[in-house]
């Protein structure tokens, strides 16, 4: 296992900056999910950790080693791509052992690791099948063949995006079980915030190449750092009302609603000014019919 640290990491292509001054610390054994809308830079960030993209500036560490100039094959990472990248002419066993054969591993070692990983992934009965004989739910399991290389860090780039809703739910459960069983550091990329909420120990919300907020799923849900996070995390989404601050007290703020009604809200008033125009965020489950509300 290994921790992953990004210190002031920036990625740019010419004048186009796609990741801006990223600072993250991922602990040994954590399941961390990068989430955000399309184009926010989450896959680019994952590819920099993998070594498939260079770091323009800043420092990337896996464990105690600075990895900026270390080739991908020497980083101790295993990556699962959205496309699965299964060789159609090879059996499941041959797909799983391909990387070890390229690395020159002994046949006994290859056979032992393939057998062990097949048991973990519940694929032992499929080892002789080729790709076209696998169902849609079996292919993602084979794609996690990177386990045979015993990586310190797993990187998963939207591995379930090609599946239907029912299979996605099933595979989420399997990936969660796999993480608990192995205890390895996992970094998972998705644009699906429901997937992020159900899988992650910690979520990194990205917006336009910057880190908008880092925290546990319920922390982001109940205490979003800004309006973007508040509107992105949660299904259904948070509702917003324009309000005006009319008074403040210790740990309370009074606001005027669009219908001119004034209400006190139990929120931090330290950085709120009377007269400021703000947005009031309301989750659907926080609303009650007036005849039963306090």
Curated annotation (Swiss-Prot):
What is this enzyme's EC? 7.5.2.1
Organism of origin = Klebsiella aerogenes
Q: Where in the cell? A: Cell inner membrane
User: Which GO molecular function annotation, any one, does this entry have?
Assistant: ATP binding
**Catalyses which reaction?**
D-maltose(out) + ATP + H2O = D-maltose(in) + ADP + phosphate + H(+)
The record's Gene3D superfamilies line, in alphabetical order, gives: 2.40.50.100, P-loop containing nucleotide triphosphate hydrolases
Task: Tell me what this protein is called.
Answer: Maltose/maltodextrin import ATP-binding protein MalK
Write out the residues that bind ATP: 36-43
Q: Which InterPro entries match?
A: AAA+_ATPase, ABC_transporter-like_ATP-bd, ABC_transpr_MalK-like, ABC_transpr_MalK/UgpC-like, Mo/tungstate-bd_C_term_dom, OB_MalK-like, P-loop_NTPase
Top-rank taxon, per record: Bacteria
Q: Which family does it belong to?
A: Belongs to the ABC transporter superfamily. Maltooligosaccharide importer (TC 3.A.1.1.1) family.
The record's note on quaternary structure and interaction partners says:
The complex is composed of two ATP-binding proteins (MalK), two transmembrane proteins (MalG and MalK) and a solute-binding protein (MalE).
């Amino acid at each position: 296992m290994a921790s992953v640290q990004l210190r002031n990491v920036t990625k740019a292509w010419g004048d186009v900056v796609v990741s801006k001054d990223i600072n993250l610390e991922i602990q040994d054994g954590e399941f961390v999910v990068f989430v955000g809308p399309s184009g926010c830079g989450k896959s680019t960030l994952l590819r920099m950790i993998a070594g498939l993209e260079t770091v323009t500036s800043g420092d990337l560490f896996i464990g105690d080693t600075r990895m900026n100039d270390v080739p991908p094959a020497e980083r101790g990472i295993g990556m699962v791509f959205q496309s699965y990248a299964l060789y159609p002419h090879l059996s499941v066993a041959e797909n799983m052992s391909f990387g070890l054969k390229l690395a020159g591993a002994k046949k006994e070692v290859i056979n032992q690791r393939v057998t062990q990983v097949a048991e973990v992934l519940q694929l032992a009965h499929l080892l002789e099948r080729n790709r076209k004989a696998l169902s849609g739910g079996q292919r993602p399991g084979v794609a996690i063949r990177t386990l045979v290389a015993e990586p310190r860090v797993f990187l998963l780039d939207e591995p379930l995006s090609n599946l239907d809703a029912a299979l996605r739910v099933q595979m989420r459960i399997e990936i969660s079980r796999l993480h608990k069983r192995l205890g390895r550091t996992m970094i998972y990329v998705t644009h699906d915030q429901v997937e992020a909420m159900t899988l992650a120990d910690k979520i990194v919300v990205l917006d336009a190449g910057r880190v908008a907020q880092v925290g546990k799923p319920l922390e982001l849900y109940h205490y979003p750092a800004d309006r973007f996070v508040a509107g992105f995390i949660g299904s259904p989404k948070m509702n917003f009302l324009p309000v005006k601050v009319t008074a403040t007290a210790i740990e309370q703020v009074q606001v005027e609603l669009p219908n001119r009604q004034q209400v006190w809200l139990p929120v931090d008033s330290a950085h709120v000014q009377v007269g400021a125009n703000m947005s009031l965020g309301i989750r659907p489950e926080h609303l009650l019919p007036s005849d039963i509300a306090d």
